[in-house]
């Protein structure tokens, strides 16, 4: 006889509903008005390895091709912009915003390979092609080593700073006893990428100051720095997609040399992995291996810069809308990495003497930013304002939209003579100044508030945009000349008769 039994499997209930994030195309209406904006030539010069301090401050900054360049581009408020058509929107029911539809990052200076290194680099043996290695007995076997680091081209566009990740020293549990010299626990840290932060040069995304106390394991430019790598996973999973609309990336490297580290091996090789040796080979030599990277050949055929890019659909929900009238351009370009060596003599020389010559090194970078922006408008409906307030509460404040305070139900005190010395001072407190939430971070400020132009055909990127959308500029008006009348004085030729 068939008997019905309830299922023994678990029943999974659906998760509680959450507020849905919608794309900006659902509440942003685009117009047919476009503007071009471009920066001037942006230059920076400094020392490629470390800052130089002469009077207690960084008189010569650190400028390296392995630094992030993070441009914070300031845009004018479109609601206070002088528009050609004042009827384009209703200020009582709508607000205007900018949408980035095209950009071009110009790079100057020639292609070049830059070398970085350390005069006291921790290397013991050449493990690629060396003689028989024995146990390290010298207390200091550091050597002068230079490398051409990893080659990187990167560009991240968004209206919020890009997010980076790196490993640093974590906190050990109280139940785990630690002593001096133990391997520290690791912790993955997320932080905004700032202008001047170091990129991954092939030695990992680490806080080298905290994790390598020997100060001899990596080149000079990162030995006391933190190398960050963009956290593409976190930015792609961002609910609103403000930190990364899209990105361009090209990385390449290979290994040039193979070394091992000198020092005491903190974690010995298990005995079952080898057979003991003799003649200074017990215990075995250092098994902490390290490879020096190389960025390989640099060509103009693999350049990401000096060409236009058009934004049709962003990877996230923000389809190029510049909230708070700003956008962030994060750039890395190690293909223009020439470190210029300069020399100056201390006195006039008749014969060459290297002790009378001072050597210097400098690195220079050159940028130019061009954009095409589209004017858009947002309807101030109750649903849209509630959504924007949840996403970013400062937007409504910048648009001079606030909530009216409720009617006071308690009894308030009102003095008759407010300027009398007999009562407490009745002077109103000044409202607190609006604080920039990103003021503690370092960016390269680029002000484009006075650089907007509607004449797109007057700029290189504007002409490329007009060609992209299929709009041709009108030819200049030319005055028509009267054609001179021609009078033939010769007799008309008679037709040849057919025979």
Curated annotation (Swiss-Prot):
Keyword list, A-Z: Capsid protein, Disulfide bond, Host nucleus, Host-virus interaction, Late protein, T=7 icosahedral capsid protein, Viral attachment to host cell, Viral penetration into host cytoplasm, Virion, Virus endocytosis by host, Virus entry into host cell
Quaternary structure (record): Self-assembles into homopentamers. The capsid has an icosahedral symmetry and consists of 72 capsomers, with each capsomer being a pentamer of L1. Interacts with the minor capsid protein L2; this interaction is necessary for viral genome encapsidation. Interacts with protein E2; this interaction enhances E2-dependent replication and transcription activation.
UniProt source species: Human papillomavirus type 53
Name of the featured protein: Major capsid protein L1
GO molecular function: structural molecule activity
Entry function: Forms an icosahedral capsid with a T=7 symmetry and a 50 nm diameter. The capsid is composed of 72 pentamers linked to each other by disulfide bonds and associated with L2 proteins. Binds to heparan sulfate proteoglycans on cell surface of basal layer keratinocytes to provide initial virion attachment. This binding mediates a conformational change in the virus capsid that facilitates efficient infection. The virion enters the host cell via endocytosis. During virus trafficking, L1 protein dissociates from the viral DNA and the genomic DNA is released to the host nucleus.
Superkingdom per UniProt: Viruses
GO BP term, example: endocytosis involved in viral entry into host cell
Gene Ontology CC: one annotated term: host cell nucleus
Pfam families: Late_protein_L1
Gene3D superfamilies linked to this entry: Major capsid L1 (late) superfamily, Papillomavirus
Record's subcellular location: Virion; Host nucleus
Compositionally biased tracts (Low complexity): 484-493
Record InterPro entries: Capsid_L1_Papillomavir (IPR002210), Capsid_L1_sf_Papillomavir (IPR036973), dsDNA_vir_gr_I_capsid (IPR011222)
Chain segments carrying region Disordered: 472-499
């Amino acid at each position: 006889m068939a008997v019905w039994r309830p299922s023994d499997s678990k029943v999974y209930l659906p998760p509680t509903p959450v507020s849905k994030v919608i794309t900006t195309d659902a509440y942003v209406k685009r117009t047919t008005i476009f503007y071009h904006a471009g920066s001037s030539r942006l230059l920076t010069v400094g020392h490629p390895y470390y800052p130089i301090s002469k009077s207690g401050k960084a008189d010569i900054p650190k400028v390296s091709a392995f630094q992030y360049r993070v441009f914070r581009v300031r845009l004018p408020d479109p609601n206070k912009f002088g528009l050609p058509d004042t009827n384009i929107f209703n200020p009582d029911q709508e607000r205007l915003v900018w949408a980035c539809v095209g950009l071009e990052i110009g790079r100057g200076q020639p292609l070049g390979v830059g070398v970085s290194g350390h005069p006291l680099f921790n290397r013991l043996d050449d493990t690629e092609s060396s003689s028989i290695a024995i146990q390290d007995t010298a207390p200091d076997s550091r050597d002068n080593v230079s490398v051409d680091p990893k080659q990187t081209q990167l560009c991240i566009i968004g209206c919020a700073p890009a997010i980076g990740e790196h490993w640093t020293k974590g906190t050990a549990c109280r139940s785990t006893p630690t002593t001096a010299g133990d391997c520290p626990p690791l912790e993955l840290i997320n932080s905004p990428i700032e202008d001047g932060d170091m990129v991954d040069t092939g030695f990992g995304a680490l806080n080298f100051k905290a994790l390598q106390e020997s100060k001899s394991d990596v080149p000079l430019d990162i030995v006391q720095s933190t190398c960050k790598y963009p956290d593409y996973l976190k930015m792609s999973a961002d609910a609103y997609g403000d930190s990364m609309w899209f990105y361009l990336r090209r990385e390449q490297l290979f290994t040039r040399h193979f070394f091992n580290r000198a020092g005491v091996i903190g974690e010995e090789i298990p005995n079952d992995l080898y057979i003991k040796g003799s003649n200074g080979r017990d215990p075995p030599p250092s098994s902490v291996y390290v490879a020096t990277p190389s960025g390989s050949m640099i060509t103009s055929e693999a350049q990401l810069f000096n060409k236009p890019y058009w934004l049709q659909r962003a990877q996230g929900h923000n389809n190029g809308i510049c909230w708070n009238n700003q956008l962030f351009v994060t750039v890395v370009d190690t293909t223009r990495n020439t470190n210029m060596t300069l020399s100056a003599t201390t006195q006039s020389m008749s014969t060459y003497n290297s002790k009378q010559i001072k050597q210097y090194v400098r690195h220079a970078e050159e940028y130019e930013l061009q954009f095409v922006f589209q004017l858009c408008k947002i309807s101030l409906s109750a649903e849209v304002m509630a959504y924007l307030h949840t996403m970013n509460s400062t937007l409504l404040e910048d648009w001079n939209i606030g909530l009216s305070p409720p009617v006071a139900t308690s009894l308030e005190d009102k003095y008759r003579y407010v300027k009398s010395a007999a009562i407490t001072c009745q002077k109103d407190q000044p409202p607190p100044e609006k604080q920039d939430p990103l003021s503690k971070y370092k960016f390269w400020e680029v002000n484009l508030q006075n650089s907007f132009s509607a004449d797109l055909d007057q700029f290189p990127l504007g002409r490329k945009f007009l060609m992209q959308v299929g709009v041709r500029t009108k030819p200049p008006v030319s005055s028509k000349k009267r054609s001179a009348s021609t009078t033939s004085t010769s007799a008309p030729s008679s037709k040849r008769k057919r025979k």
